[in-house]
Amino acid sequence: MLFDQRGSGQSLPHGETAQNTTQDLIADIEVLRQQLGIEQWLLFGGSWGSTLALAYAIAHPERVSGLILRGIFLGTRAEVDWFLHDMGRFFPEAYDQFVSYLTVEERGDILLSYHEKLMDPQALVHQPAAERWASYETSCSTLRAGMRRVTGR
């Protein structure tokens, strides 16, 4: 069974961030489990979903038979810094596109600058910011190194 968490996918209202905390999402998962009459379940999650699955398992260990996690993201400062700064070394074109949306001043705090744009009520501001963020994340999700780069020949 798959579900879309608050504000994402087919969940309505789309893109809503009010009352959309990790604790709210954990509560939603628990309500869903109860409504489906599932005693214990195996959770699967990737990226943010891995974080959410782990948080749910910590809150409700008796309801989780196991976890299958991929692309694990724990939300640590080091992981966020890697995403915002260091990952660009491996994906320079994607990184350039990502930061080029920001002014030189805004690049001093990429996370804050994107947060402000993503939370802006005006679609002309938040939509392109969301597209740039998603494009960067998607571009960096796979590593396709050419054979020359791998073998050195």
Residue ranges and their predicted role:
Residues 1-12:
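Conserved alpha/beta-hydrolase
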Residues 11-14, 35, 54, 78:
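Active-site-proximal flexible loops/turns
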Residues 14-25, 78-81, 85-86:
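Catalytic nucleophile-loop/oxyanion-hole region of alpha/beta-hydrolase
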Residues 23-42, 59:
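Conserved acidic catalytic loop of the alpha/beta-hydrolase fold
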Residues 39-85:
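Conserved hydrolase catalytic core segment
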Residues 82, 87-153:
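Alpha/beta-hydrolase
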